[in-house]
């Protein structure tokens, strides 16, 4: 017979304490929706989950970077499109001026519009900007942060070398579309430049404009290819993000069916332990 210790009551108390802890843990998981709320719940699982969360955040930013790249290219392509329309009008004027039916006075009128259109091309090349960066002026070889064609970071991780190449980045370049770059020259006090004041000049202007149109078309083609690639990159990033989030959820999120069963079990055992503790205490008092 034990006098100072009631072993049965101590066992009931210990069991009740354990079940209460399990009950609180299950309640926390059910209320937060997470299986891992702290490192003690699953140290290894928490580490993997945090790495996956970091990956998801990186993919979110990569998707934003790619979208920014598309926005930039669309601005540049829009400006190039307007330049193309201007060049087509300039070509019409040059062909008109090459006709012998025009007088020198009429050629002067057509040349006035011709020069104004060239000035507009020059203005567009200087004024086309994205986030404060001038895209088409030819003063910088890039529109980003590198000293060459810009590098868009479209991956979740740091840039890594793979067989002499790179991953997670995309190199994008926008060439200069200034008048000089496309082979045209404004008329000044000391330089006749590209003009259509005479029939011979008009013929020369047609050749120069054809070359300029080809330059603009090539640039627009490149920009279209870049945009298509970035759109595919965004789709791929979205797919990666979905699968990574799913993997992280499988590790960190609670299984409500399983945890509800555990909660109910702990609740029953906790109540049973309290009942047993009361029964043992009553027996001890009745002796």
Q: Language-model features: where?
A:
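Primary detection of the long, small/polar-rich alpha-helical "axial" segments characteristic
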Residues: 1-282
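Hydrophobic topology marker
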Residues: 285-287
């Amino acid at each position: 017979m034990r006098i100072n210790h009631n072993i049965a009551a101590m066992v009931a108390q210990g069991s009740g304490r354990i079940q209460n802890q399990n009950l609180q843990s299950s309640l926390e998981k059910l209320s937060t929706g997470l299986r891992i709320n702290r490192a003690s719940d699953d140290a290894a699982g928490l580490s993997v989950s945090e790495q996956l969360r970091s990956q998801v955040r990186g993919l979110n930013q990569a998707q934003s970077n790619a979208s920014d790249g598309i926005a930039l290219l669309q601005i540049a392509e829009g400006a190039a499109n307007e330049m193309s329309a201007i060049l087509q009008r300039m070509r019409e004027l040059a062909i008109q001026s090459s006709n012998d039916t025009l007088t020198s006075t009429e050629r002067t009128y057509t040349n006035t519009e011709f020069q104004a259109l060239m000035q507009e091309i020059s203005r567009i090349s200087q004024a086309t900007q994205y986030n404060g960066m001038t895209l088409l002026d030819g003063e910088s070889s890039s529109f980003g942060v590198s000293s060459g064609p810009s590098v868009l970071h479209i991956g979740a991780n740091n840039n890594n070398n793979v067989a002499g190449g790179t991953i997670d980045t995309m190199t994008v370049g926008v060439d200069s579309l200034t008048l000089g770059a496309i082979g045209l020259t404004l008329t000044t006090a000391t330089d006749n430049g590209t003009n259509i004041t005479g029939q011979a000049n008009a013929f020369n202007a047609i050749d120069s404009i054809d070359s300029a149109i080809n330059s603009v078309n090539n640039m627009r083609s490149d920009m279209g290819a870049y945009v298509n690639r970035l759109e595919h990159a965004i789709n791929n990033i979205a797919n990666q993000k979905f699968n990574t989030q799913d993997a992280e959820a499988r590790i960190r999120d609670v299984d409500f069916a399983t945890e509800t069963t555990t909660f109910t079990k702990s609740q029953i055992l906790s109540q049973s332990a309290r009942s047993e503790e009361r029964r043992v205490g009553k027996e001890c008092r009745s002796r």
